[in-house]
Amino acid sequence: MNGPSSAAPFKRLEGKVAIITGGASGIGAMAVELFHENGAKVVIADVQDKLGEDLADKLGQDVCYIHCDISNEDEVINLVDTAVSKFGKLDIMYNNAGILDRSFGSILDTPKSDLERLINVNTIGGFLGAKHAARVMVPQQKGCILFTASACTEIAGLGSPAYTISKYGILGLVKCLAAELGQYGIRVNCVSPYGLATGMSMKGGVDPALIESSMSQMGNLKGEFLKTDGIANAALYLASDESSYVSGQNLVVDGGFSVVNPTVMRAYGLIK
């Protein structure tokens, strides 16, 4: 009879250094904890200083917080340079930070300023993060650049026109950078979530259980709720050596929603 194993649990990011933008809350905070649990030294980048500092204090000396507005190139430069100065290198850049519309509206009701605000953070912020991560990864001849996009890039109707444009830009960036940076051993991918309850989606005091129930009813995969750990685990896979030959890909985490049109099956009584 075999006794209990004394082997330490396998840590998928052992020895790696990661920056996670938008890491103080939501998907980013879950990714910070998961990457740290798997052996990475993590730099949390956010503008939510109290949340970011509290999370870094909770996780200990291998995690630190740096204030960073990702739409400000000087702050992104400081973020990357400080991470390398503190931990000696940068292996993973997870460009997760993003914002939503003020309201889910028609293009007829969307002011130009809302589109500019979303592109400035969601698209340009990701561009700057990737640019300066690549600056330090190219000499290393190795690295992983990740983004959080959205399932609204796979099927219409999940996001507003302005939000969808800002996330489509990320898909173009992923493909372009995968082509350019592959010669340096740098992989570039993104994760595209279906709707889920995060601090960003719950602004205004919306009950997270209500969001989960609503998204589940609209979703394709029944009996499961998408939570932040589902996206963080997808990012962990793409950041780890388990995906060492995966680049230029959009990992859609939506329970099959974007590939299903149930109209015909419903007409024939095959599904409810």
UniProtKB/Swiss-Prot annotation:
The active site is at S150 (proton donor), Y163 (proton acceptor), K167 (proton donor/acceptor). PROSITE patterns: ADH_SHORT (PS00061). One of its GO terms (molecular function) is oxidoreductase activity. SUPFAM superfamilies: NAD(P)-binding Rossmann-fold domains. Pathway: Secondary metabolite biosynthesis; terpenoid biosynthesis. Its EC number is 1.1.1.-. Keywords: Oxidoreductase. Pfam families: adh_short_C2. It comes from the Eukaryota. Signal peptide: none annotated. It catalyses: 21-O-acetyl-isomeliandiol + A = (21S)-21-acetoxyl-apo-melianone + AH2. Expressed in maturing fruits and in juice vesicles. Belongs to the short-chain dehydrogenases/reductases (SDR) family. Oxidoreductase involved in the biosynthesis of limonoids triterpene natural products such as limonin, a compound with insecticidal activity responsible for the bitter taste in citrus. Catalyzes the oxidation of 21-O-acetyl-isomeliandiol to (21S)-21-acetoxyl-apo-melianone. This is (21S)-21-acetoxyl-apo-melianone synthase SDR. It comes from Citrus sinensis (Sweet orange). The gene is SDR.
